């Protein structure tokens, strides 16, 4: 399934935007290589985990090597994290706008490829 959704909310403006699109996952290609070269060492350190995010563990831990401690990895060490790195490219196809108001909400949908918009029941 290549669908992707983004949801944004502004408490101040009382507006929610939900965008729907198609995602392409890039792994070990020119796009990821170019993006990886722009990352900082503190960001690369996050990709050095030996387990996947959300895996169950027995105790609270960061899953980073104990010898890493609070230090940043060397350039050579950081390259080991590239295998866990990807770029998610997304093309937004449509989005919905929702305005929350005590006198009645308002909702609209915009379909970008068709240059169409319509009102929806909130």
Model region roles, listed by residue range:
Residues 1-14, 22:
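A short mixed-secondary-structure module that forms the rim of ligand-binding clefts
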Residues 15-122:
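Charged, gly/pro-rich active-site loop segments
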């Amino acid at each position: 399934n290549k669908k992707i959704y983004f949801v944004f909310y502004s408490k101040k403006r009382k507006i929610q935007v939900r965008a729907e699109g198609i995602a392409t996952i890039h792994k070990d290609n020119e796009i990821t290589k170019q993006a990886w070269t722009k990352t900082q060492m503190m960001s690369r350190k996050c990709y050095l985990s030996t387990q996947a995010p959300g895996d169950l563990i027995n105790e609270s831990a960061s899953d980073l090597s104990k010898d890493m401690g609070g230090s940043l990895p060397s350039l050579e060490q950081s390259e080991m994290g590239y295998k866990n790195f990807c770029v998610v490219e997304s093309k937004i196809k449509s989005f919905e706008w929702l305005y929350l108001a005590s006198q009645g909400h308002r909702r609209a949908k915009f379909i970008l490829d068709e240059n169409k918009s319509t009102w929806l029941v909130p």
